[in-house]
Amino acid sequence: MAKGVREKIKLVSSAGTGHFYTTTKNKRTKPEKLELKKFDPVVRQHVVYKEAKIK
């Protein structure tokens, strides 16, 4: 069976709350780091989430 192209990543809040989302990303089509604006329930605001590796 072939190995999938999509890799698991973690989106970490830039607000410094420690909150994160997990998602998958195709490394071949999107080699750059992902930055998305998502809701942080700790500060109850939309903040920028940046890509980090899952350890």
From Swiss-Prot:
Provide the family line. Belongs to the bacterial ribosomal protein bL33 family.
> Which protein are we looking at?
Large ribosomal subunit protein bL33
One cellular component (GO) term of this entry: cytosolic large ribosomal subunit
The GO molecular function terms of this record are:
structural constituent of ribosome
Query: Which GO biological process annotations does it have?
Result: translation
Q: Which Pfam families match?
A: Ribosomal_L33
Family annotation (Gene3D superfamilies): Ribosomal protein L33 (2.20.28.120)
Name the domain of life this protein comes from: Bacteria
Keywords for this entry? Ribonucleoprotein, Ribosomal protein
Keyword Ribonucleoprotein applies: yes
